[in-house]
Amino acid sequence: ATQMLGENTGIYIGYSVDTGRNVYLQPSLASQGVKGTVTNALASAFVGSLGGGKSFCNNLLVYYSVLFGGQAVILDPKSERGNWKETLPEIAEEINIVNITSDSSNQGLLDPYVIMKDVKDAESLAIDILTFLTGISSRDGEKFPVLRKAVRTVSQNQNHGLLQVIEELRKEDTAVSRNIADHIESFTDYDFAQLLFSDGSVENAISLDNQLNIIQVADLVLPDKDTTFEEYTTIELLSVSILIVISTFALDFIHSDRSIFKIVDLDEAWAFLN
């Protein structure tokens, strides 16, 4: 086993119990392509038992990365970081907390066509969300092409939203298209679902321009990690769909100004990486 932990300089995160040596990390090092670095892997995971300090260590690295000039987006499904403006007054002006609730004023805010800047990205995400909710596989030669055609048609409209996909399916007026339209529409009755479905008139109101952005979604009901997809309840399907949209939006943020080191922090990542 190696006794080499971390870098020679960087953020102090603790010390090795075996050697007594301090451990430092430079989170941005792997992304800079520095000659001689051991890895250029950009993904990190905090794994351990309940109460083992995963969140604390994670929060520490994000905090110091921001102090060193980085930019971060934290997806906080359990809303554990809502008080950071008060507890971190030294960077309060750079903290942006986005609270997403099922209030009617937020209708359509997380519609793929609203939240994604690029239409092609929005179209791809729309397909992902609708196939996830309905369980229609891309290998389903009867239903998938019909759904795909409706989504592509909506993407070509000047204003677009997921509710228009239902309209396009009804215009097709076949037994298959009506069945898919009814299936998708059955989700829109839930208060929570209105975040995902817009009529094309909603404008993106989520900004990630601050150095530290925290996205919180109220009332998420996440499935247990041992629950199979077939056992998900409707509200669990919608909750995971919302996490997929937000995480895709956050990852899109990575591709903005590449001169700035960025972190996308997915708390409870197992819920949508399973």
Task: Identify the meaning behind each predicted range.
Residues 2-22, 79, 86-89, 102-274:
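P-loop NTPase motor domains
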Residues 9-99:
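Glycine-rich phosphate-binding loop of nucleotide-binding enzymes
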